[in-house]
Amino acid sequence: MRSYSSATLLAPVVLVMFGCSLAAQDQQPAAGRRGGRAEAAAGPSVPHDPHDLSGIWRWSGRSVLTFSNDAPQMTPQGQAKFDASRVSYGPRAVPPALGNDPMGKCDPMGIPRLLFYGATARMEILTSADRVVQFFEWEHVYRPIWTDGRELPKDALDNPRWLGYSVGKWDGDVFVVDSIGFDPRTWLDHFGHPHSDEMRLQERYRRLDRDTLQLTLTLTDPKTYAKPWVSDTKTFKLQPAKDMLEIFCVPSEEEVFNKRVRDPAGGIVTKK
């Protein structure tokens, strides 16, 4: 028996629940809850090293699951891709059975969507001599951020990745991550905001105290947006050091869920 079955079947349900409204979602902090029970806080704050981001973190506070509510004007190419997205979340929501969210096919969410949505589960940050690694409970994937002084690969556009290519360095007490080479099939968020293969992303992490991590992001993609998209401040809270759950999207289970729940809810009936 696979231990992750219930978690994977939960994923589409979560998407439907998130489709209710942005306002409702915006008022419900994701931090500190799992399965309807509040998790214990990580403990009182103690002295910390601001250059050490290690720990298990979860999204906290009142913040939308995208860069900000003020998306920049799109280019004609960007607008066409946006109009073609059929989302199950927010003001443009359609029944999930009628949507085309790549996540509905178990495609990887990619970055930055994992930072917005995946971190409503948990994100662990691990540090070694030559890299910082983000490990996401949602999808159970890890993302290396190289800190050994290497440059971003010059052939990144020819070999795009779901998570892109990332390098990081410290600017005072701020950890700055620059990334390129993202697969353009991913969406930026649950609203269906698109990006092109030329998207560049900068993340700026700052550990305010032992228990609080802040993040701001800047997206630059002249093919899709008329100007850079700067996020509001995202806040994460330190969580107890507990085992990470396996939250996978399993195609075989997704297919069963679609036939039994999602398609009938959208008025699609498959004849036997």
Residue ranges and their predicted role:
Residues C20-K272:
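PEST-like low-complexity, intrinsically disordered acidic/proline/serine-rich tracts
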Residues L10-C20:
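Bacterial N-terminal signal peptides
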Residues M1-P12:
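Bacterial N-terminal signal peptides that target proteins for export
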